[in-house]
Structures are given as structure tokens and as C-alpha cells.
Design a protein with these regions (language model features):
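Extracytoplasmic/lumenal domain signature
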Residues: 4-78, 99-138, 143-214, 218-257, ...
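Predominantly extracellular/luminal regions of secreted and cell-surface proteins
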Residues: 83-106
Length: 542
């Protein structure tokens, strides 16, 4: 429902007063635990997580033909080995478990944030109304790669940059452009790619080949500017393939590609906001010394639940999938978390996660058993008029989809600016081992929020740090050689905070001047992130 700016401001003021008085007698957080028994190490549904309980009806299309079943020609099985052959951050949150928040170690005894460089971006007209897409949006994480000398020789990187020890930042932003920058000083390493569609989500680089996947979050103002996904050759910046636009197999009319895909066995897996999950074989090869692809085995999974509609509990996925063995896990705008066998594209189990789920899950292996941690925004479930309600954060058994525990936070939301959890959590290591850390927006008041750390085993809140401005940006963490953690958390007020992981104490803050919805990428002591204020920042910890 569209509302005027004046009405939204009035409601925010009213909610501010209501939430102030509610704090006098209402619990703003609560914990629910469930009887959970670890069974056999087999992925399967239970009575509570059967797809039929969510009213799921699914269809498959393979190479343009609807089919009842499918078996992948080259089966996928993901080991515990590193996801990427590159040094750097090649997908949202770094890898297939979405726990690769940074690359390399930071230096010890450094605790101050410093702006090293900035790069201006521009704006792009929206496909509806009179507004513009500006800066870097949600999730908006840059990619960072340190190329080898041989790789640089094959690329159209500027000759002066080929002579240096180059670490390249590749950043797709909401002005429809892809920027290629030197992480040291922000200087351009090659020409900008101008696609002309807004990139709200995060791109992805193939983990062993110089291929770049781009997914716009919306269409443009012209008829031909419809949203679809792209694959580019990073050696020469040529577009190799596009897919997903105006797909007749889709149930939902809207289309976008905020999700950051994963690549395995020459296959790509990409969920879309049109409600489809795409998978196809790249058949990547060199032809006349030039990298190209010849996609085939093109598979689309379509489904809907008993509550799916164009008006509420939408189909479509904005989060990025995680993978364990041959299973893909993804949540959707309609509050459904799915486990899918990647080799049959069959939905194995489905769990109700209540509300619009935008933050990506993180996968944790605990004593050999896989678990998922994921939170939701407050979109469909708040009270009708004041838009208040509990927003859940879940620990879920990845084998059968059953709840282990749920931690709720009481939040506010307004049209277009959701409260709750929009981010993806940190799964701690070293000195923050056994902690799951994430921000909650619009609690305990309208414009503020908190960063919280929970015990992964019990859901108990270990620490909570108040934030004067709420955060959609996902936190990143890095460790020094001794295993001491520092967290970087950006917020809607344009602040970047440096936070001690063990107790949540803010030890430094830095203003970047405008709302930071995007998630930073971190390599060593260097951090890169864009703001809605049409700037990309290079920041270092000193």
C-alpha cells in the first residue's frame, strides 16, 4: 500500500511514543526453545516440515520443456574444501556457507578507522515514478580479488596497473555501472562497464574462471530495459550471456536478481525474485584463446505455497543460497525456507519462517551436524495500524528443517523501510566461537537498533550493543594472528563502527556521510563499501 511521506512521518512519530511506553512493561526480546533430537544423518522432511504442509506445488522446466522429474548429468557434491581458488571475496559473504566475511588477517593493535579514498558514482532513473536509484543499495557488497601475474596478462587491465601487485575491487552499483578499482588508492584499473540497470544486490565471480555474474534488482524506464541476469568475461569485459528476463515460466510478474549465485561443477545456481530458481551448465571453454560459454541443461524450479500471491507473501528470493553437500538452502519473500536437492531440483523440506526473509542464512557444522541461522524482516506479520510486532531469528536443523530455538525481537516497520533483520549474521570463530552476531533494525525505538550476540547452543543473549541508527548492512568480522576479533558494522545514519567482538564495545566510529545499506568487503586491514550518497569508500584500520 502506497502512503504519503507526511503520513509516514506521522506514523513514525506515533510509533515512537507508543514504543517508549511499551518499554515500561513489555519484553522486547524473548526466547523459544524446542524439543530437538538429532537423528540419522539423512536429509529428509518430518511431519512439521513436509512441503505439503506449506501447500507447496512445484514444477520443473528443463531446456524449455516442462517435465515431471530431472537428474543432473554431472551430479554436484560439495566437499569441505575452499570454495574459491582466488585470493579474495568472490560472492556475497565469500563462499557457499556465507561465512567468508573477510579475507586475510588484520594487523594487531590497530583500532582506528581512516578514510583512504573515495570514488563518486552517479544515479539512474527508476523504472517507475520520478525517482532515481542512487549509490550502493542492499546488499551491495563489492567483490575483491588479488589476481596472479598470469591472470593480469590476459586481462584488459590498464598497462600501468599490470605492473603492480594489484588487488582489484569490482563493484556493481545502483547507477547501472560496474567499477574496477585499485584497493590501495581507489584509482581505476580498467574501463567501467555500463549496463544501465540498477545493481542492488551483490555480484559474483566464478571461483576458478574469470567470469562475472551480474544481477539487476529492477527494470529500467524503457521497454527494452527489463531486468535479466548477465555473465561477462573478465578478461576482456565482453558480455557472454543473459537470462531470466520476462520468463514465461515465472508465476510472479516482478523480476530481479538480488541473490548472489554459486558455481559448482561448471553449473550455476541462481534464485530470482520472479520466484524461479535457475540452474544451468556453463560449458566454459577457450575458443581461439578466448574464454566463452555454451550454456545448456537449463533447469528452472517453479513453486508456490498456500499463501503465495502478488499482493502478500510474494514469491521470489532476495537472499543468497547456502549449500551443504548436494543440498541448497534458500528463503523467500513469502516466509518459506526451502531445502532443495541440487541434483534433482526437488524440494526436500520446507519450514515456515513467518515473514519476508531477505537476509541470507549462514551454515554451521556443529559436531558434524549442519545447522542454519537466519532472521527475517517485519513485513507481513506486524500489527495492522501501528506496524509493530515480534521479528524472529532462527536456529534450524539443516537435515530436517526443524526449529532448534527462536529468538524474537519486538520491532517497528514502515512501508518500504522494514524493521527486523535484513542482514546476514556472523558465525563467530576464535575468541567469539559459539556466537552468532547480527543487527536488528527499528528496536527498541523507531530509528535506532541494536547489534546482538547470541549463544549458538542456547539462543541466550550474550551481549547487546545499542545503535542510534538502525542497520540493514550485514556486519563483517576479521581476526588478528592471535584470534582477536573486530567487527565492522555500518548503519543507516552513515556511520561505520569498529566493534570488539567479545563484548560488543564500540571502539571507533567513522562518518561516511550517507545511509549505508550495502555490506562491506574486507581484505586484511582494508574495507570497501558504498553509500546511498553516491560514493564508494576505501577505509583502513590503523
Amino acid at each position: 500500500m502506497k502512503t504519503s511521506r507526511a503520513f509516514r512521518i506521522f506514523m513514525m512519530g506515533l510509533d515512537l511514543i507508543v514504543m517508549f511506553f511499551l518499554r515500561l512493561f513489555k519484553k522486547f526480546t524473548r526466547l523459544r526453545t524446542f524439543d530437538h533430537h538429532i537423528g540419522t544423518r539423512v536429509v529428509n522432511n518430518t511431519e512439521e516440515t513436509s512441503p505439503e504442509k506449506m501447500g507447496i506445488v512445484s514444477k520443473l522446466e528443463v531446456d524449455g520443456q516442462e517435465t515431471d522429474s530431472y537428474e543432473r548429468k554431472d551430479p554436484v557434491y560439495v566437499s569441505d574444501a575452499s570454495y574459491s581458488e582466488y585470493e579474495g571475496i568472490v560472492t556475497f559473504r565469500g563462499n557457499h556457507r556465507r561465512n567468508g566475511y573477510s579475507y586475510g588477517r588484520m594487523s594487531s593493535k590497530k583500532n582506528h578507522l581512516n578514510i583512504d579514498w573515495t570514488v563518486d558514482t552517479v544515479r539512474l532513473q527508476k523504472g517507475y515514478g520520478k525517482g532515481f536509484w542512487t549509490g550502493s543499495g542492499w546488499t551491495g557488497q563489492p567483490l575483491i580479488v588479488r589476481w596472479t601475474e598470469d591472470q593480469k596478462k590476459r586481462m584488459n587491465i590498464y598497462s600501468t596497473k599490470k605492473e603492480e601487485d594489484l588487488t582489484e575491487v569490482i563493484y556493481s552499483t545502483m547507477d547501472g555501472k560496474v567499477y574496477f578499482l585499485d584497493i590501495e588508492d581507489g584509482s581505476f584499473t580498467r574501463d567501467v562497464i555500463d549496463v544501465g540497470l540498477p545493481f542492488k544486490g551483490s555480484g559474483a565471480i566464478h571461483p576458478s574462471l574469470p567470469l562475472l555474474h551480474l544481477g539487476p534488482g529492477d527494470s529500467g524506464p524503457k521497454k527494452e530495459d527489463y531486468a535479466r541476469a548477465y555473465i561477462y568475461n573478465l578478461e576482456n569485459q565482453k558480455k557472454l550471456f543473459e537470462y531470466g528476463g520476462k520468463d514465461p515460466f515465472s508465476i510472479r510478474s516482478f523480476c530481479g536478481f538480488d541473490s548472489s549465485p554459486l558455481f559448482f561443477n561448471d553449473y550455476i545456481f541462481e534464485p530470482s525474485e520472479n520466484g524461479l530458481i535457475y540452474s544451468f551448465k556453463l560449458n566454459a571453454h577457450y575458443e581461439d584463446d578466448e574464454l566463452t560459454i555454451a550454456p545448456d541443461e537449463f533447469v528452472k524450479l517453479q513453486y508456490h505455497t498456500y499463501r503465495s500471491s502478488e499482493k502478500k507473501y510474494w514469491l521470489g528470493m532476495e537472499d543468497s543460497p547456502v549449500v551443504w553437500e548436494n543440498y541448497l538452502y534458500i528463503a523467500d519473500n513469502g516466509g518459506t525456507l526451502l531445502c532443495i536437492d541440487m541434483n534433482t531440483m526437488k524440494i526436500i523440506w520446507a519450514q515456515d519462517v513467518v515473514d519476508d526473509t531477505n537476509g541470507s542464512p549462514v551454515l554451521s557444522i556443529e559436531e558434524g551436524h549442519p545447522y542454519l541461522y537466519i532472521g527475517t524482516s517485519l513485513h507481513w506479520s506486524p500489527s495492522r495500524y501501528l506496524r509493530l510486532g515480534y521479528c524472529p531469528f532462527f536456529k534450524i536443523d539443516a537435515l530436517n528443517g526443524e526449529y532448534v530455538w527462536i529468538r524474537d525481537y519486538y520491532c517497528n516497520t514502515i512501508a518500504g523501510i522494514s524493521g527486523g533483520v535484513q542482514s546476514s549474521p556472523i558465525l563467530g570463530e576464535n575468541d567469539i566461537k559459539d556466537l552468532i552476531i547480527f543487527p536488528v533494525a527499528r528496536t527498541p525505538s523507531v530509528m535506532d537498533g541494536k547489534l546482538v550476540a547470541l549463544d549458538i547452543h542456547t539462543g541466550k543473549e550474550i551481549w547487546s550493543t545499542h545503535m542510534k541508527n538502525y542497520a540493514w548492512s550485514s556486519p563483517v568480522v576479521s581476526y588478528d594472528e592471535a584470534g582477536n576479533s573486530l567487527i565492522v558494522q555500518c548503519d543507516s545514519g552513515g556511520m561505520m563502527h569498529l566493534i570488539r567482538g567479545v563484548d560488543g564495545k564500540i571502539i571507533d566510529s567513522l562518518s561516511l556521510g550517507a545511509n549505508i545499506e550495502a555490506t562491506p568487503a574486507m581484505m586484511g586491514d582494508r574495507i570497501v563499501v558504498g553509500t546511498r550518497g553516491q560514493k564508494i569508500y576505501g577505509v583502513s584500520i590503523r
